[in-house]
């Protein structure tokens, strides 16, 4: 009997600054309704942990900051209980560890489709300017580790500038005082360095891409934001068709020999030039738009991870919209308690041993967190 394909996905936070995991899972389920989905969460309160039709099994992971050994030990314990065929990480902060663990994962039967370490390092915000020498237009930037160097910004970049965190968040600064404010906020949130990038006035485009690792582009969907949250995240958008943008995306993927998913943030400046503002090394939270546009890139990533051939797709057509919304998810406190206390939540039967791959890894202790909230009080 053929074993059910099991795909693990991280990034199940679905707030006003959502992770991509829920959208990636929705895309995979559209292509493979019978696939088993394992949700990997870093927080018990991530809404994707409890949303119906998302994960069959949800497990807590330790934060990437604890190191590769703790993260891999936990994953292999999960793998022993619910064998995983493909892992799709969706968060910036975890990518470097999963890239380092790729060979170990493969040796234990877990396939991935991730960028090479050197390409991942080059897309870091503090190294992105190096792409200029390779032929990609990138705004000038400074790497700031000491607020004492803020006065240099006026001479080297001029104002306004964009102040960016190491992993997430970006704010426009008009003055040195603004830079100092955002520097401390971002350093406290994400650590050093903080990146100061020259502000480019113009029109922003976001492009989700899937590279084959040999310089080829499997597929892409370009989008222009129509609604924004106060964090600048897309709450609505529409696909666009632009041959110059398509060529820019293909050239960037070719220069990087990018392997796996990514999101390119591109600015068409008022001067008519295209500038690469940022590369996010994973699917964006709006990736379900790719399904609506007829380019199911998450499923293509699963196929590539499994070694299956995937033909390159033409750019998506213009005029497909998405609108994000929020809703209240109702759940039992027992589900929250199961994930909080035991580190796992199951909505489907755990696979029988004869439905599992022999991974040769002992079942480790479950992640245990703090006790749940009291709901009944004495009179």
Where is each model-derived feature located?
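Peripheral (often C-terminal) accessory segments that flank ATP-dependent C-N-forming ligase machineries
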Residues: 299-379
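Active-site nucleotide/adenylate-binding loops and adjacent lid/helix of ATP-dependent enzymes
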Residues: 118-201, 212-216, 243
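ATP-binding N-terminal substructure of ATP-dependent carboxylate-amine bond-forming enzymes
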Residues: 1-113, 376-377
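Short, charged, surface-exposed secondary-structure boundary motifs
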Residues: 68-73, 114, 120-126, 172-174, ...
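ATP-dependent carboxylate/phosphate-activation module, predominantly the ATP-grasp catalytic core
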Residues: 177, 181-185, 191, 197-257, ...
């Amino acid at each position: 009997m053929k074993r059910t394909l099991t795909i693990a996905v991280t990034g199940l936070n679905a707030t006003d600054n959502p992770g991509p995991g829920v959208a990636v899972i929705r895309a995979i389920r559209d292509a493979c309704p019978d696939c088993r989905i394992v949700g990997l969460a870093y927080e018990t309160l991530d809404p994707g942990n409890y949303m119906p039709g998302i994960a069959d099994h949800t497990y807590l992971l330790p934060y990437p900051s604890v190191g590769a050994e703790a993260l891999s030990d936990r994953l292999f314990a999960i793998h022993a209980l619910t064998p995983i065929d493909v892992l799709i990480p969706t968060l910036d902060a975890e990518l470097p560890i999963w890239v380092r663990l790729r060979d170990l994962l493969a040796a234990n039967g877990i396939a991935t489709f991730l960028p090479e370490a050197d390409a991942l390092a080059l897309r870091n915000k503090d190294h992105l300017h190096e792409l200029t020498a390779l032929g990609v237009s990138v705004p000038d930037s400074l790497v700031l580790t000491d607020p004492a160097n803020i006065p240099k910004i006026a001479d080297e970049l001029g104002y306004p500038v964009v102040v960016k965190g190491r992993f997430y968040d970006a704010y426009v600064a008009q003055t040195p005082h603004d830079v100092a404010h955002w520097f401390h906020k971002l350093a406290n949130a994400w650590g050093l360095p903080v990146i100061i990038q020259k502000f480019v006035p113009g029109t922003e485009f976001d492009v989700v891409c899937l590279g084959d690792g040999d310089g080829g582009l499997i597929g892409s969907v370009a989008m222009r934001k129509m609604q924004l949250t106060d964090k600048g995240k897309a709450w609505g958008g529409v696909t666009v068709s632009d041959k110059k943008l398509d060529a820019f995306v293909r050239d960037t993927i070719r220069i990087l020999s990018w392997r796996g998913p990514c999101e390119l943030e591109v600015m068409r400046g008022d001067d008519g030039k295209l500038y690469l503002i940022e590369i996010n090394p994973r699917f964006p939270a709006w990736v379900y738009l790719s399904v609506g546009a007829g380019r199911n890139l998450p499923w293509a990533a699963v196929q590539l991870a499994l070694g299956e051939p995937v033909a390159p797709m033409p750019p998506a057509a213009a005029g497909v919209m998405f609108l994000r919304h929020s809703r209240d998810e109702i759940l039992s406190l027992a589900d929250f308690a199961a994930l909080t206390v035991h580190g796992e939540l199951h909505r489907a039967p755990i696979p029988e041993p004869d439905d599992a791959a022999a991974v040769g890894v002992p079942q480790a202790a479950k992640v245990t967190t703090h006790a749940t909230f009291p709901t009944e009080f004495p009179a």
